[in-house]
Design a protein with these regions (language model features):
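ATP-binding N-lobe of GHMP and related small-molecule kinases
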Residues: 1-71
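Conserved active-site and cofactor/substrate-binding residues in soluble primary-metabolism enzymes
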Residues: 18-20, 41-45, 75-79, 158, ...
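Generic beta-strand or strand-like secondary-structure segments
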Residues: 49, 53, 80-83, 87, ...
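Short, surface-exposed acidic
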Residues: 57-61, 93-98
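DPxDG-like acidic metal-binding loop motif
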Residues: 72-94
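ATP-dependent small-molecule kinase catalytic core of the GHMP/sugar-kinase superfamily
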Residues: 94-209, 221-252
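Conserved glycine-rich beta-strand-loop-beta hairpin in the small C-terminal domain of fold type I
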Residues: 216-218
Length: 252
C-alpha cells in the first residue's frame, strides 16, 4: 500500500518484500571510487554521496548487479545504495535510512530486516508504526509499462488512513483486499485507467493485486499453492514483461 496518512499527511507505504530478488554489490578493490555492473542502478555521484553520508571514504571499486528493472517501482535504487554502503562497511540501518533519504529524497525501508512489517514514511525515512507479519503468500509479478523514477516532490497520492487502520491483525485475504483498494485508489487518481491487473486477478483467482505507486511494477497475490497453471503466460499476454513468481510473508 502507499498513500497519504490523512489528507495533507505524510506519504506512507507498506512494502511488498521480495526476498528472491534484489541488488548485490561486491567490493573488488581499493583506489578511487569506481562502479561497474549491468544494469547500473546508481550513479557515481549518488554512490559518492551515499558513502559520504554514512561516514565512509569515497573510494573503492564495486561491482553492482540488479536482477529487477531500475525505475520499475521495485526499490532497486534504494537497494543498490544500501548494498553499496554495506559492502563498504556500514550496517547501521538507521544511518542507512538517513543516507538514502539524503541521496534520493525518498526511500523504501529495505535497510531493515523485516521491511514489510513497517508503516514507512518514505519522504522522511521514518518508521511510523511496527506492523504484524504478512501471512505466507505467493506473488506473481511483472512490469506493465516503461520505467518511471520516483519524484520525491510528488505527494499527489490518495488518503489511505482507513486502509492503514485496518491492516493490523487482518488475515491474508483481508490484507490482499486492502492492497487492491490502495492500488485502485492510486489508479483512479494518477492513472493509468486501463491497468489490466484487477480483471486479470479476478480471472486467475487471485486474492488481490498490488502496484508500484510510481513505476510499472504490478503483482497478483495468491494463497500458497493456488497460482493456476498458465498464469505466467496470462500475465505476458496481458502485456506484462519480466514476469516472476516468488514466495513472501510468513517468515519467507
Amino acid at each position: 500500500m502507499q498513500g497519504r496518512l490523512q489528507p495533507g499527511g505524510p506519504v506512507v507505504l507498506v512494502t511488498l518484500a521480495c526476498p528472491a530478488h534484489g541488488v548485490s554489490v561486491e567490493r573488488t578493490g581499493d583506489g578511487p571510487l569506481s562502479l561497474e555492473g549491468d544494469p547500473l542502478v546508481v550513479s557515481s555521484a549518488q554512490a559518492a554521496h551515499m558513502l559520504d553520508k554514512v561516514g565512509l571514504p569515497v573510494a573503492g571499486r564495486y561491482v553492482i548487479s540488479a536482477d529487477l528493472l531500475p525505475g520499475g517501482g521495485a526499490g532497486m535504487s534504494t537497494a543498490a545504495l544500501v548494498a553499496l554502503a554495506r559492502a563498504a562497511g556500514c550496517d547501521d540501518s538507521a544511518a542507512l535510512a538517513r543516507a538514502c533519504l539524503a541521496v534520493e529524497g525518498a526511500s523504501d525501508p529495505l535497510m531493515w530486516s523485516t521491511p514489510d512489517r513497517l508503516l514507512w514514511a518514505s519522504r522522511r525515512a521514518e518508521i511510523l508504526q511496527r506492523l504484524d507479519p504478512v501471512p505466507a503468500c505467493e506473488i506473481l509479478g511483472g512490469f506493465w509499462g516503461p520505467p518511471q523514477r520516483t519524484d520525491p516532490e510528488d505527494s499527489d497520492f490518495p488518503d489511505i488512513a482507513d486502509l492503514v487502520a485496518a491492516w493490523p491483525g487482518a488475515d491474508l485475504a483481508a490484507k490482499a483486499d486492502l492492497a487492491s483498494q490502495s492500488a485502485q485508489r492510486c489508479s483512479s487518481l494518477r492513472g493509468p485507467v486501463d491497468d489490466p491487473m484487477p480483471e486479470l486477478g479476478k480471472r486467475l483467482g487471485a486474492l488481490g493485486h498490488a502496484r508500484a505507486h510510481t513505476g510499472p511494477a504490478r503483482a497478483l497475490i495468491f494463497a500458497p499453492g493456488t497460482v493456476p497453471e498458465g498464469a505466467e503466460r496470462a500475465m505476458t499476454e496481458a502485456g506484462l514483461s519480466d514476469v516472476l513468481r516468488f514466495a513472501t510473508g510468513g517468515g519467507a
